[in-house]
From Swiss-Prot:
Species of the source: Bacillus anthracis
Binding site for Mn(2+) 4: 832, 834
EC number of this enzyme: 6.3.4.16, 6.3.5.5
Gene designation: carB
Record-given protein name: Carbamoyl phosphate synthase large chain
Binding site for Mg(2+) 3: 820, 832
Length: 1072
């Protein structure tokens, strides 16, 4: 069927900010969809709130709206633009929920807008647990025994009948939010209450736990002619019970017999047909390992995280084709863009094994509960490709960027058998490493299978790796053993440690013996047809499929998995850099391992290498490609950390030199540079011992800011107020020694300013200056940023511009630099300089129209700023106000303190823009998920040091009509200031207390500033966590609270009696 000609304009709904459960995969799918629809001649309008994406670039769609994804704003855009149709299935759960809300509100009917791809009835049938269960019964498809519940009493009824354990699955939620496995009544109360709160329709499915079954996923496509295919089937190494986003996944499935494969394939196709989905769909199934009994777990009637993985695993671009199907094209009409010969109705075939390992944020949140269940906790993931599962797994392990090069963790070697058993039974993020350790210590595969029901096939593969370790250690210098180890995916790093040599010595030894990997192509058809796509992976085999051209090439290092501190912003910069390299006439080569991102879409670069970002894996590519050089500025700390090793191998680092990179990162060298340039910075020193740290802090005076050198995202950074806190930090947060010094600075309570600039060594161009709403001390990634600055005097702005230009030239920066300043007592101080792309590059690029990563790349390639039409100086400021607001995923991470400080905690960001600061802030806050009601109650409980400041805030809340609630101490201070307040009991009271008010939804805001000593038992911690669990905005910074007050005050009409007004006027006349 040809494409539809009765529609012209299509509104694509994006997925909003990155949160746990919904990450960069929707930037990839949304970008693909917009381009795909434009190719077919449709006018595309995009709405998304996330400025850090390629999707929200003006070139992606005909019109781009960066606005909150709420009914209020999306309805306004629909009424203004009058699209013929909307496509919501590429915006994740956000897009689906938005489509349902728009339909129910009547806006779609009012404006004559059609839903494309997946009809509303199919969305509701797949997402509403009751309707889905009914459909499965009609199809005779087995589902676990289950019950739909809307309250706790109904949950008790089901459990009394079926017994524990039960799984709670809330309806219309993302990444299993609010759900979990209940083993007893206490867990049932907690998880059901949470699930009902998080479900927008207050509905949960309770089902008998089938934990222990194999979990299998089928990624399927269907068109309007009822052609349906399986793009990819995947198997979770972790059995049912761990969310698929937190599971280690392999593709294709490894342990299914042909009968099992065909049985589950037929079921998946039957389901997509019954739902009438036109596009992509993900079906999750459970299979009993001892019989042919299977169960349908759930269906995602949209493009998902698994679709992105399946697309990268097979080379089959699901989102691109789903968009074409949505406008009426059929699979047998669409040419496969990989082979450019076959059609999209051919099912992909794989002659390799793909492994996906999640990347969790537990290195950031040490207090978080690491147990894995049905609620997702990973922020991102890595993917690797190999010719066997062992190779594929080990490549994925070293892609995680946790300083791990092999399936072993030193701290697990001390575990006894009983501890290992407990941790293997109750899965956590280290389970596969513990399984390997158990096998090393002689635990049998049978015992491990009994503990966790992981398939014997996977346990055998882990045992193969452990047996090979013994071979390697027993045969030092043996080339045959080395060859076998390399074929199994062992890294030079591991072999070097086993043979007591350096990694470079192993690398040289292999080269002398011609022991290097070959590169194979990902072609969707197992080499049956010729492929036109240069998408490669390395393996130790005979035939090399790589074609090295004569063109001059440049390598860009990607930023690896999404994690807190290094998000999609770096992928944005990477993609723009690749495009600039192509524009400059070079062959653009990218190395990355993140299946979710736009940068690993094979159509972006001239060559894509899906490889770990380690020195060994990168050098294999460089040895073959022999590029002009490597750009490390856009891949975050991942790429910067490789710069020194690459230079040791004789590789040219393009842009800012290694020496100058080091000068910006090394404390003493940086201090010397600032002194030479006459630029002030907070008083600070470097400590290499605990004693030294104590002495420095005494000399500088508390409070001090302490952090390790060379960090990203404020990792292990803290403000300490007294000596005992400093000693706790030095013993627990960092391992201090001569090679890893700790930096100690005077903490200045001032206004923080952030600047991004581009330097060519001679000229320094400043696209924008941003002001942070929160004072210095809250990580820049967690602050609300405002452009243009609203409270900076011209004199201070000039100082900042002068310092930025001096730093760009003085540090010999070639490319991008990011500087953070603090304004303290009308003086500008430099806090830090990052000689690379920062997380504000996409935001400022979109606002100012300066494509910063593109311009910087061309500078790096030798085209100076003047040639590109830019000179030294500050770009004229825009008239509108733009706000960048952080988005957090605390609801997914139990036991994590929500207090903001110098260590970054946000997972994503949104943008609000309007004519005034208040309106822009309103949009930013609403887009970030903060509800802003114009009246209600606010609980105020603050530390003693903040009481004076909190009084003014409380007074303003009272004046706009809010009720004030406070515990005795704070209430007394308010009463003394004649501010009406209701006293509430502290949380240790057995009577109705502060936590009850939060649980019952009777407070709209909680203002709670940190009481020191962050152990979870603290009252402050419990209040903050209770707020998160109950969806109440908890404000831990008084600066953020003031920003919200500005918005509330701008929304509130004043109400004064005539007498008050007359008295005020009389007072003014008397005093005139």
């Amino acid at each position: 069927m040809p494409k539809r000609l009765d529609i012209n304009t299509i509104l694509v709904i994006g997925s909003g900010p990155i949160v746990i459960g919904q990450a960069a995969e929707f930037d990839y799918s949304g970008t693909q969809a917009c381009q795909s629809l434009k190719e077919e001649g449709y006018k595309v309008i995009l709405v998304n709130s996330n400025p850090a994406t390629i999707m929200t670039d003006t070139a992606t769609a005909d019109k781009v709206y960066i606005e909150p994804l709420t009914l209020e704003f999306v309805s306004r855009i629909i009424r203004k633009e009058r699209p013929d149709a909307i496509l919501p299935t590429l915006g994740g759960q956000t897009g689906l929920n938005m489509a349902v809300e728009l339909a129910k509100s009547g806006v779609l009917e009012e404006c004559g807008v059609e839903i494309l791809g997946t009809k509303l009835s199919a969305i509701e049938q797949a997402e509403d647990r009751d309707l889905f269960r009914t459909l499965m019964q009609e199809l005779n498809e087995p589902t676990p025994p289950s019950e739909i519940i809307h309250n706790l009493d109904e949950a008790y009824g089901f459990v009394n009948e079926i017994g524990y354990p039960v799984i709670v699955r809330p309806a219309f939620t993302l990444g299993g939010t609010g759900g979990g496995i209940c083993h007893n009544e206490e867990e049932l109360i907690e998880i059901v209450t949470s699930g009902l709160k998080h479900s927008p329709v207050t509905q949960c499915l309770l089902e008998k736990s089938i934990a222990g079954c194999k979990e299998i996923e089928y990624e399927v496509m269907r068109d309007s002619n009822d052609n349906a295919i399986v793009v990819c089937n995947m198997e979770n190494i972790d059995p049912v019970g761990v969310h698929t986003g937190d599971s280690i996944v392999v593709a294709p499935s490894q342990t299914l017999s042909d009968r099992e494969y065909q049985m589950l394939r037929n079921t998946s196709l039957r389901i997509i047909r019954a739902l009438g989905i036109e596009g992509g769909c993900n079906v999750q199934l459970a299979l009993d390992p001892y019989s042919f009994q299977y169960y349908v777990i759930e269906v995602n009637p949209r493009v998902s995280r698994s679709s992105a993985l399946a697309s990268k695993a097979t080379g089959y671009p699901i989102a691109k084709l789903a968009a074409k199907i949505a406008v009426g094209l059929t699979l047998d009409e669409i040419v496969n863009p990989v082979t450019q010969k076959t059609y999209a109705c051919f099912e992909p075939a794989l002659d390799y094994v793909v492994s996906k390992i999640p990347r969790w944020p537990f290195d950031k949140f040490e207090s978080a509960n690491r147990t894995l269940g049905t609620q997702m906790k990973a922020t991102g993931e890595v993917m690797s490709i190999g010719r066997n599962l062992e190779e594929s797994l080990l490549k994925a392990v070293r892609s995680l960027e946790l300083g791990i090069y092999h399936l072993e963790l030193d701290h697990l070697k001390e575990l006894d058998k009983e501890t290992m058993k407990k941790r293997i039974i109750k899965a956590d993020d280290e389970r596969l490493f513990i399984v390997a350790e158990a096998i090393r210590q002689g635990v049998t595969k049978e015992e491990i299978n009994e503990w966790c029901e992981m398939d014997f096939f996977f346990l055998q593969k882990v045992e193969n790796i452990v047996n090979m370790e013994r071979e390697v250690k027993a045969n030092v210098g043996n080339m045959e053993v080395l060859q076998t180890a390399k074929e199994m995916g062992f890294s030079d790093h591991y072999i070097a440690a086993a043979w007591n040599k350096t990694e470079r010595e192993i690398y040289d030894m292999r080269k002398e013996n011609n022991m290097t990997p070959v590169f194979k192509m990902v072609d969707t058809c197992a080499a049956e047809f010729e492929s036109a796509t240069p998408y490669y992976y390395s393996t130790y085999a005979d035939e090399n499929e790589l074609i090295v051209t004569d063109r001059k090439s440049v390598v860009v290092l990607g930023s690896g998995p999404i994690r807190i501190g290094q998000g999609v912003e770096f992928d944005y910069a990477t993609v723009h850099s690749v495009w600039a390299i192509k524009e400059a006439g070079y062959e653009a080569i990218i190395i990355n391992n993140n299946p979710e991102t736009v940068s690993t879409d094979f159509s972006i670069s001239d060559k894509l290498y899906f490889e770990p970002l380690t020195i060994e894996d990168v050098m294999h590519i460089i040895d073959l490609e022999k590029p002009e050089g490597v750009i490390v500025q856009f891949g975050g700390q991942t790429a910067i950390n490789l710069a020194a090793k690459l230079e040791e191998h004789g590789v040219k680092i393009l842009g800012t030199s290694l020496e100058d990179l080091d000068r910006a990162e090394d404390r003493d060298k940086f201090e010397a540079a600032l002194t030479k340039l006459g630029i002030p910075q907070p008083v600070g020193k470097t400590a290499t011992t605990v004693e030294q740290a104590v002495a420095i802090a005494e000399e500088i005076g508390y409070p001090v800011l302490v952090r390790p050198s060379y960090v990203l995202g404020g990792r292990a950074m803290e403000i300490v107020y007294r000596q005992e806190e400093l000693l706790h930090y030095m013993k627990n947060a960092v391992k201090v020694h001569a090679d890893h010094p700790v930096l100690i600075d005077r903490y200045m309570v001032g206004k923080e300013i952030e600047v991004d600039a581009i330097s060519d060594g001679e000229n320094v161009f400043i696209p924008g200056i941003m002001e942070h709403i929160e004072r210095a001390g809250v990580h820049s990634g967690d602050s609300i940023g405002v452009y243009p600055p609203q409270s900076l005097s011209e004199k201070l702005k000039e100082q900042i511009i002068e310092h930025t230009i001096a730093l760009g030239k003085g540090l010999n920066i070639v490319g991008l630099l990011n500087i953070q300043f603090v304004v303290f007592k009308d003086q500008v101080y430099v806090i830090e300089v990052n000689p690379r792309a920062s997380r504000t590059v996409p935001f400022l690029s979109k606002i100012t129209g300066v494509p910063m990563a593109n311009v910087a790349t061309k500078v790096i390639l030798g085209q100076d700023l003047v040639e590109q039409g830019y000179g030294t100086g500050y770009h004229p400021e825009e008239k509108e106000v733009y706000v960048k607001a952080p988005v957090f995923s605390f609801a997914k991470l139990r036991s994590v303190d929500t207090t903001l400080g110098p260590e970054m905690k946000s997972t994503g960001e949104v943008m609000g823009k309007d004519l005034t600061l208040e309106k822009a802030l309103y949009k930013g806050l609403v887009a970030s998920g903060i509800n802003i009601p114009t009246h209600g109650s606010v609980i105020i409980t603050v530390a003693d040091k903040d009481k004076e400041e909190a009084m003014e805030i409380a007074k303003r809340f009272h004046e706009i009509g809010y009720n004030l609630l406070a515990t005795a101490g704070t209430a007394q201070s308010l009463t003394e200031q004649n501010i009406p307040v209701q006293v509430v009991n502290k949380i240790d009271s057995e009577d109705y207390n502060l936590l009850d008010i939060i649980r019952q939804g009777k407070a709209q805001f909680v203002i709670n500033t940190l009481t020191k000593g962050k152990q979870p038992a603290r009252d402050g911690f419990r209040i903050r966590r209770e707020s998160v669990e109950n969806g109440v905005a908890c404000l831990t910074s008084l600066d953020t609270t003031r920003a919200i007050l500005r918005v509330l005050e701008s929304m509130t009409f004043s109400a004064h009696s005539m007498k008050e007004i007359t008295q005020t006027k009389r007072h003014e006349v008397v005093h005139a």
